[in-house]
Amino acid sequence: MSVTIDAQLAQSFGLTGEEYDKLVTIMGRTPSFTELGIFSVMWSEHCSYKSSRIHLKTLPTKAPWVIHGPGENAGVVDIGEGLAAVFKMESHNHPSFIEPYQGAATGVGGILRDVFTMGARPVANLNALRFGDPKHAGTRRIVDGVVRGVGGYGNCVGVPTVGGEVNFHKAYDGNPLVNAMTVGVAKQDKIFLSAAAGVGNPVVYVGSKTGRDGIHGATMSSAEFDEEAASKRPTVQVGDPFIEKLLIEACLELMATDAIVAIQDMGAAGLTSSAVEMAGKGGVGIELNLDAVPQREPNMSAYEMMLSESQERMLMVLKPERTEVARAIFAKWELDFAVIGELTDTGRITIRHKGEVEADIPLAPLADEAPVYNRPTVPLKAPARIETPADPEGIEKALLTLVGCPDLASRAWVWNQYDGSVGGNTARRPGAADAAVVRVEGTRLGLALTTDCTPRYCQADPKTGGAQAVAEAWRNITATGATPLAVTDNLNFGNPERPEIMAQFADAIKGMGDACRALDFPVVSGNVSLYNETRSPSGEAQAILPTPAIGALGVLADASKSIGLAMPDAHDLVLVGGIRGELGQSLWLREICQREDGAPPVVDLAVERRNGDFVRSQIGAGAVAACHDIADGGLLVTVAEMVMASGVGCTLEAAPTDVAAHAFWFGEDQGCYVIATSDGAALVAAAEKANVLAMRLGRSGGTDLELPGTVRVSAERLREINAAFFPRFMGEGA
């Protein structure tokens, strides 16, 4: 290929001038076109974590129940009975803006592979979706494509989609977020890792053929968007969930033998990343013969094959004597199987194609010795706490506005496009509890699963917002009765080269770390997505809200004893936790007063821990019939959601006089729960003994939510208003 290799070409590949000079020094010569491509993807933000790595190292990652933390394809935790949960969350933001259906679908496919490559059968998918303002011209198209893509892939591959989030804000108009999470279950003694070993062992390619889709997808995901984003459609991968299903079954069948030495999926940067990471982790070299790579298109170059991000592909190192056993399994499942290389003792990656050496690079500079930056930050000014605004329209009208607003409206339109029950092990479906609950087949165990983040809090105060995201995930797991075990994160931010954005990232990590340590909630896997910005024709950069999405997992000894939102008739409602009436950054402030200001609610991690441990103990003692944590919309929205979930009404008592009524009912105070119990007095007494604030709120019964003299609205009316937004926004039958 007669192309001049220089700093200008390297810059078009996403490398800086300094990085190009560094790679020339490493190579001792000008790189080939293929070598330049390999460096550009491995040193991209998406693959190298060069701006985030120093901050990520501060997060707590260890606990007695953690089997494998960050560094593998997914995190692994002990759930008892010799079993492990394997889970991770990952973004597909940039592709989902360019091509919403395929971007979202292949995001699901990629995270599934991260989990089953470790020997786990996937048992659940979740997703955290952030879209632009519903009034923005492009939002409806992106919502439609993303939701269909998530459902289309997950449904076909036979893994239930059991939970997640959907939020709207104008900051995502040009840059939606699609964060996908998969959870699998494996035997603890059957976990497969990615470190290659055994000089001379064969390197095997399995799955789909390689095409030209997705080339430079990793570098695209490491840059801002502009008005020409649509021209990048060729960098979006195209997925086939039916092939993925075959690949899952073939890999799990092979894993039941003793053939596999190491295994890695081909994700970002495709064959390049999988080969470099496997050999690098194992401290060996690797030689590839691209003539043997199964190709979907004719005349593919070495550069194209190494950088293609075609989906449904895996790379394995096998024991030589078991190669034919493996070949037979993949032939049975009608998948490609090719020996494309072997491990060496050189510490280098050598790539041959049509008799020529196309690349010969030392491995260390591509992986562990990739550039790492301690980017500059600026101090962020914490917003002042706001004075409680006057109530402009009354409690009942505000309640109806809130339950119908885009961020609180029923997500049934979304969930109904997902198969949430395939496999028959979903114990708590979306909307039925604060976290989804999935039974672990062959046991009584249950996994509680959630995703959480409140980006408007993070925008106002990234440290508090980071802590709150972790605390809310812990609280949602707790509300089901499960013991919270661990976290996977998906850190979505703007351009790290802007000091104010890097400060948001660093502060959010500090808050997350504080919360994880206080709650014994280690981070075992995750993903960083930077450069989530759109540049307008005038050159102005619009960053997303800082969005450190948290995926969390907990375990129940008995899935059948999980707790949901639906409250029975004739039960006391008890508030656990103290209400200050925190209206800063609340949905009430935004939807009723059209303001987005003030400090987010205080996150007191000691109180969070004490209250949550108390709630879990009461659930374990059989004293709790329903439980829901206070989050978006505040206390009255929490109660309304319990009314809508059950169809049972309730009568509430007046708010305490030391807090304005609207602040009491709509403040988004943290560390609080509403519990339905048969004996409210006993639960309040137990709380006092545990040094936990608690008070009786009222009693369930009838079909209306009633606050005497202030609110009287039927469960049916609440449901009607709550259900209206999505069908109206998307169009009936959309």
UniProtKB/Swiss-Prot annotation:
Residues annotated as binding Mg(2+) 1: E90, N527
GO CC aspect terms: cytoplasm
Origin: domain of life: Bacteria
Annotated positions binding substrate: S91, H92, N93, H94, R113, Q237, E309, S310, Q311, S529
UniProt-annotated binding residues for ATP: Y49, K88, D489, G526
Subunit structure, interactors included: Monomer. Part of the FGAM synthase complex composed of 1 PurL, 1 PurQ and 2 PurS subunits.
NCBIfam families registered for this protein in UniProt: FGAM_synth_II (TIGR01736), PRK01213.1 (NF002290)
Known function: Part of the phosphoribosylformylglycinamidine synthase complex involved in the purines biosynthetic pathway. Catalyzes the ATP-dependent conversion of formylglycinamide ribonucleotide (FGAR) and glutamine to yield formylglycinamidine ribonucleotide (FGAM) and glutamate. The FGAM synthase complex is composed of three subunits. PurQ produces an ammonia molecule by converting glutamine to glutamate. PurL transfers the ammonia molecule to FGAR to form FGAM in an ATP-dependent manner.
Protein name: Phosphoribosylformylglycinamidine synthase subunit PurL
Naturally occurring in which organism (per UniProt): Gluconobacter oxydans (strain 621H)
Lineage: Bacteria, Pseudomonadati, Pseudomonadota, Alphaproteobacteria, Acetobacterales
This protein's encoding gene: purL
